[in-house]
Amino acid sequence: MKSKWLILFIVFGLILTACGGGSDDAAEEEVVAEEPAEELDSPATTAAAAEPVADPPSICLVLDIGGLGDLSFNDLAYSGYQKAIEDFGMVGTFLEPDGGGENRGELLELCAEAGNDLIVGNGFLFDGAMNEVAPSYPDINFAITDGVAEPGNVRGMLFKHAEGSFLAGVAAALKTTTNNVGFIGGVDFPLIHEFEQGYLAGVAAINPDITVQIGYASVPPDFSGFNDPVKGKEIALAQYEAGADIIYHAAGGTGTGMFEAAKEVSEATGTKVWGCLLYTSDAADDYIR
């Protein structure tokens, strides 16, 4: 039993590292290739590793808006989830929400009723659902990324987004040939402002005369800006048209539209433009850095 809880403790660290805030040392994260998602009414269970632990701990990861394939925070959390299963022989289940995430609480309850030892809600939008569901399951550990919740059995995982974004800004300032770069945020609210401000500071640290274009896909209470590739492409094309040659995003699945725009502009003009993502991916080949 002690080994079971030790593994759970280590898994918290894996998830923290995967989401970019586990330590002060820079680390490269690799987004896992897209795989088919499970149906909500019959979640799949991943087999334990080759050397299973007696009474292996179980983890349930509930993704948020955009789900797998967003090339952003959902894919990154999923990579940490897979590593926990592979390295520690855990039994794992992952679920994806409805389009707007309205069923977050239902999915958390589904994980709890299945008896999972650790349940992770991926994103600050789980705070309300955590407050409602977690008190009914005091013996189960819950965690929420980028947020906090009141119940004593819920742990919030908060990160220094501005620091990583500062480095992205430095890189953009060093790479640009037009002295014009862009930023796309998913939703115009404080959490994403951390990414924006870090990026702006990084650019200014290299060259304060560089123009930085700012665009957001939506404003609260509309959180669709985290999964609107069409809007992301529209904003990116406008920024490229206005002279940007590098764009950095913190917009979840909306950012995939930015990658499409980068590819289109590069192929149409013969001039290389870049779409930049905080988390590494090869999904758009040379158009992501």
Residue ranges and their predicted role:
Residues 59-85, 93-104, 124, 188-193:
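Extracytoplasmic "Venus flytrap"
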Residues 135-159, 281:
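Flexible loop/hinge segments that line or gate small-molecule binding clefts
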Residues 81, 166-214:
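An alpha-beta-alpha
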Residues 279-288:
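Single conserved hydrophobic/aromatic residue that forms the stacking wall/gate
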Residues 157-179, 232, 289:
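Hydrophobic alpha-helical segments within soluble ligand-binding/sensing domains
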Residues 20-28:
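Bacterial lipoprotein signal-peptidase II cleavage site
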Residues 198-243:
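Extracellular/periplasmic Venus flytrap/periplasmic-binding protein
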